[in-house]
A protein has these predicted regions:
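Conserved beta-loop-beta element that borders a ligand/cofactor-binding pocket
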Residues: 58-82
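Substrate-positioning beta->alpha
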Residues: 79-89, 98-121, 127
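Mid/C-terminal beta-alpha module of Rossmann-like enzyme folds, strongest
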Residues: 114-117, 122-169
């Protein structure tokens, strides 16, 4: 579960906050071989860290019901933004184009996480929301687009099978899914500032 809830459940309940948000991960869905998932998709976490997130989500939702408090769960995809993006990898000389056919990743700009949370605070409820952009995309495409914007040659493609990866990095490629963000748009009226990686990288280029 969540150590904050474990330690301070009574204090939180006693304070009767008007809104509670817990930031989780789309990793709770596990692998779906590239198929679309939404908030109603049964959870099937693969990694230990995602199993722990499921336990934390369940604890917060139970806490919400027991105490009649609004708790919103936000399942975030891969976070990027200033200081954490494809350009940084080029700057550090670590940019690689790993290719695993059919593999996509889901992403979210940090500014859109903040925007979604702000929209949610205005509409307290006990609800789960995916916070991810409109376009799950192959990681090698993101690297190639960043290279194009920088005016440099893209790194050569490296087959996933032969790539030198840490166990954690390799584990991310064991999960392949496309995560829907329709609920956060429909129910919170949220409009993404960076609906895909192209829009975001063009904006981030100005900060490089």
């Amino acid at each position: 579960g969540d150590p904050v809830l474990n330690q301070y459940a009574n204090e939180i309940a006693g304070a009767k906050p008007r809104w509670i948000g817990y930031l989780s991960t789309v990793g709770v869905y596990g692998n779906h071989d590239g198929a679309w998932v939404d908030e109603e998709t049964p959870l099937n976490p693969v990694s230990k860290r995602s199993v722990q997130r499921v336990a934390a989500e369940e604890a917060w939702l139970a806490f919400a019901e027991q105490n009649d408090l609004p708790v919103q769960i936000f399942r975030l995809s891969g976070i990027y933004g200033p200081g954490r993006n494809a350009f940084e990898n080029f700057r550090k000389g670590t940019a690689r184009r790993l290719v695993k056919p059919g593999q996509v990743f889901n992403r979210i700009h940090v500014a859109d996480i903040a925007g979604a949370l702000k929209a949610a605070m205005a509409k307290p409820s006990t609800r789960v929301f995916n916070v991810t952009d409109d376009e799950p995309a192959p990681p090698q495409d993101v690297v190639a687009f960043a290279a194009e914007l920088l005016g440099v040659e893209a790194p050569p493609e490296i087959p996933f099978e032969t790539a030198d990866l840490t166990p954690m990095a390799r584990s991310f490629y064991g999960e392949n899914k496309r995560v829907s963000n329709q609920r956060v748009k429909d129910e919170l009226g949220f409009t993404f500032r960076y609906p895909d990686y192209r829009v975001a990288l063009k904006a981030l280029l100005e900060t490089v």
